[in-house]
From Swiss-Prot:
Key word S-adenosyl-L-methionine present: no
Temperature-related properties: Optimum temperature is around 60 degrees Celsius. The enzyme is stable below 60 degrees Celsius.
Activity control mechanisms: Strongly inhibited by Co(2+) and Ni(2+), and slightly inhibited by EDTA.
Binding site for Mn(2+): 147, 180, 206, 241
Protein name as it appears in the record: L-ribulose 3-epimerase
Length: 297
């Protein structure tokens, strides 16, 4: 059964303990099954206390990051690449210690606009580094899920097909795709077909609107997306992601160009998203049942 989650920045960008606890309480109140924490620094957090609170509320947890430029594992600078591996290993440990089993986000290269096309050497350095991190993650009971993002946030992996090729080159069975409807709407020729093509290798999904606001108010064909996820038998985690200038994280807001205030009432946004995703999945399942029913007299 799919767990429906929510990105922590819908609630707060702070790592203060009181804010983290409020984030968890809001997540449960809005009806979600999972919280996705992003850019959570273990040095700032009571990990044991947070893990207990997550468990007490019956929530799942995932951790997402975007590698910084000075931690780009595809870099030819060995110190920079080594820092990236260190960040990834720390994130794996954090995920394990919080009781999670998925690391997601931009793991293959530095997050941000690149002014040059990627090189084969860059690709090879990244696949080799992630293959090693994936083994560490596997021992910790954690999977790596590569977010496929638009060309303005990475030059390495922009389509699901590129992600599949990348995973194949790592040789790892512990690396999967993290698909995001916002990014797919920009880069994929057909989002539904891309999902079908990636069947069996999808490990995590972000559900977000074309303008990153309320679901259903942009131009994304969510019915086609839910139909495709149902068709490939995806029954794993989906998390709602939305950003507004109402809640700003300096590390992420500039890289993702969050200039407009698309919402102010985050609880209304979250409850709407939970209902929208739940109904979308249920509708897709019911349609699949109808088209497969033979109805013999």
């Amino acid at each position: 059964m799919a767990r429906i989650g929510i990105h922590s920045f819908v609630w707060s960008a702070s790592s203060a303990q009181s804010e983290l606890e409020r984030t968890l309480a809001n997540t449960r109140e809005a009806g979600f099954d999972l919280i996705e924490f992003s850019y959570l620094d273990p040095a700032d957090v009571d990990i044991g206390g947070l893990a207990k609170r997550i468990a007490d509320l019956g929530l799942g947890v995932a951790i997402s990051i975007g590698l910084p430029g000075d931690g780009d594992i595809s870099s030819a600078d060995k110190a920079v690449a080594a820092r990236g591996v260190e960040i990834l290993n720390e994130t794996v440990a954090l995920t394990r210690d919080l009781g999670g089993r998925k690391v997601a986000g931009i793991l293959s290269a530095g997050h941000g606009l690149q002014l040059e096309a990627p090189t084969r050497d860059q690709w090879s350095r990244s696949t080799a580094a992630l293959a090693k991190v994936a083994e560490t993650a596997k021992a910790a009971g954690v999977t790596l899920n590569l977010e496929i993002v638009n060309r303005f946030e990475s030059n390495l992996l922009n389509t699901a097909a590129q992600g599949l090729a990348f995973i194949e080159d790592t040789g790892s069975d512990n690396i999967f795709l993290h698909l995001d409807t916002f990014h797919m709407n920009i880069e994929e020729a057909d989002v539904g077909l891309a999902i079908r093509h990636a069947a069996g290798k999808i490990g995590y999904v972000h559900i977000g609107e074309s303008h990153r606001g309320f679901l259903g108010t942009g131009n994304i064909d969510f019915a086609a997306i839910f139909d495709a996820l149902t068709a490939v038998g995806y029954a794993d985690d989906l998390s709602f992601e939305s950003f507004s200038s109402e809640i700003v994280d300096e590390n992420l807001s500039k890289k993702t160009a969050i200039w407009r205030n698309l919402w102010a009432d985050n609880m209304a946004l979250a409850k709407h998203a939970r209902a929208f995703i739940g109904l979308g999945l249920e509708t897709a399942r019911r349609k699949a049942e109808l088209v497969s029913a033979r109805h013999k007299p």
